[in-house]
UniProtKB/Swiss-Prot annotation:
Gene3D superfamilies: Peptidyl-tRNA hydrolase. It is an enzyme of class 3 (hydrolase). Pfam families: Pept_tRNA_hydro. This is Peptidyl-tRNA hydrolase. GO terms for cellular component: cytoplasm. It comes from Photorhabdus laumondii subsp. laumondii (strain DSM 15139 / CIP 105565 / TT01). It is found in: Cytoplasm. It comes from the Bacteria. TRNA binds at residues 17, 68, 70, 116. It catalyses: an N-acyl-L-alpha-aminoacyl-tRNA + H2O = an N-acyl-L-amino acid + a tRNA + H(+). Its EC number is 3.1.1.29. Belongs to the PTH family.
Amino acid sequence: MSNIKLIVGLANPGAEYAQTRHNAGAWYVDLLARSHNQSLKEESKFFGYTARINICGHDVRLLVPTTFMNLSGKSVVALASFYRIQPDEILVAHDELDLPPGVAKMKLGGSHGGHNGLKDIQNKFGNNPNFYRLRIGIGHPGDKNKVVGFVLGKPPASEQQLIDDAIDEARRCTDILMKQDMDKAINRLHSFKASV
């Protein structure tokens, strides 16, 4: 069984960013909330939108920061400190350039890989990288100079469908994670690849 008590979906705030690739983590958290008949509500003391759900008998808080991506740690640490949640009890969902659309992977710890949201969370936890990550594939533009425009762009419908399918499978694997264990959730998620 997992000890996850907080699931975070990284995003940039505002309607202009809502449908951009960089907000894939928030899409996952929003789906989790909706699948448990909850809606995210703004809580200014946590600098984000929050909800509380029950996954397979486990009390879990959801968070989508309203800070910009590179300040995500401020929001995550505010909520984690208030509820005494440790880094290894947190799952952070984020967009991943190194995975194609239609693929998602989970892991504990590791490098931030240049992702500004992960980097800030790690820094705010005193350079502690030992939180879980859900990496949602968005693909790569093929040129590092085009990355910013790519992550802040909206995916075409075919790519969006692949990303949505991977997020839906990640949601199903979240139940496995909470009720059984990380290895089973990882094995199932890592064997999944959406196709058009």
